[in-house]
Regions:
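Generic non-transmembrane alpha-helical segments
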Residues: 14, 18, 164, 168-179, ...
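His/Asp/Glu-rich mid-to-C-terminal helical/loop segments that flank catalytic regions of hydrolases
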Residues: 239-274
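Short acidic/polar active-site loop segments enriched in Thr and Asp
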Residues: 107, 208, 227
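Active-site/ligand-binding-proximal alpha/beta "capping" segment
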Residues: 171-208, 273
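Zn-dependent metallopeptidase/amidohydrolase metal-coordination segment
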Residues: 212-250
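Non-catalytic positions within long, well-ordered alpha-helices that form the structural scaffold/packing
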Residues: 101-105, 203, 222
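Metal-dependent peptidase/peptidase-like ectodomains
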Residues: 146-185
Length: 274
């Protein structure tokens, strides 16, 4: 994407001109996980199609709107719908909103996703706090000329998911009595679901779950110095572990069932972020 900085500036200026809030936190709501915004107050909504240079989400379960609202006293941006590499977007387009968030002054990003479980201890409906990632998407959003105004040429990935935010999430879950697991998320290009042979290989590499998002966004946010917290909703067991065929409708069904718990958890975490 040419003139990325200038395009992101144009998007950011449009958002600032059409909203009154200036959040320092942004949350991305994955497939079937959009219930968090029901708890927003003073909500302002912008359709992606109205924001200059913004891609438009095409996947069922992704609304395609940017919200600015309040959770308690905390101002938050919420993306209802994300962009996936398998939809035909470039990696720069997939991660475009995060460049805009950086220019809007966002410092912390909360990512959610619906994904498949590889770890056999994770049943469908399990919430997994992501501790690290493995990139098997075949590319990287930071390939190409680097703009130092966003970040360094060779960004560090020692702590892709903020230890500070993970500890806050764990403490909050314990106080609320919410069960969760911790694990490694593998990013897979899609749109085909994985084969049983691929899942066996991924398990051997140390992956606990696999999905088609989150990894590019994580890399870009770390590159720009933003702290990331990410939680997966395990909606199905991966190929070769479960015997039934995969269905996106089933993914949405399980995500919706677990969504209330996830939203209660993350809503509390976000309100405790400083």
């Amino acid at each position: 994407m040419e003139y990325l900085y200038e395009k992101a500036q144009e998007s950011a200026e449009y958002i600032k001109a059409h909203t009154t809030k200036r959040p320092k936190i942004a949350v991305v709501l994955g497939s079937g996980l959009g219930n968090l915004t029901a708890d927003f107050t003073e909500t302002e909504e912008l359709s992606y199609k109205d924001i200059p240079n913004f891609p438009v989400s095409t996947v069922a379960g992704h609304k395609g709107a940017l919200l600015a609202g309040k959770l308690g006293n905390t101002e938050v941006y919420a993306m209802e719908g994300r962009f996936h590499f398998y939809e035909g977007y470039s990696m720069k387009e997939v991660c475009y909103p995060f460049y805009v968030f950086k220019l809007l002054g966002v410092e912390k990003v909360v990512l959610t996703n619906a994904c498949g479980g590889i770890n056999r201890e994770f049943a469908p409906g399990t919430l997994m706090l992501i501790t690290d990632f493995i990139n098997m998407m075949g590319t990287n959003p930071l390939i190409g000329p680097n703009d130092e105004r966003f970040g360094p040429r060779f960004p560090d990935m020692t702590e892709p998911y903020s230890l500070e935010l993970r500890n806050l999430a764990k403490q909050t879950a314990d106080e609320l009595g919410i069960a969760y697991k911790e694990g490694v998320y593998m990013g897979f290009m899609g749109p085909c679901y994985e084969t049983a042979a691929e899942i066996r290989a991924f398990a051997g590499m140390g992956a606990d779950a696999v999905g088609m998002s989150t990894v590019p966004e994580t890399m870009v946010c770390n590159y720009m110095g933003m702290k990331v917290l990410a939680v997966s909703c395990i909606t199905n067991m991966a190929t070769g572990i479960q015997t039934v065929k995969h269905s996106h409708a089933r993914v949405l069904e399980i995500a919706n069932q677990a969504g209330d718990t996830l939203c209660r958890w993350l809503g509390a975490v976000i309100q405790r972020m400083e």
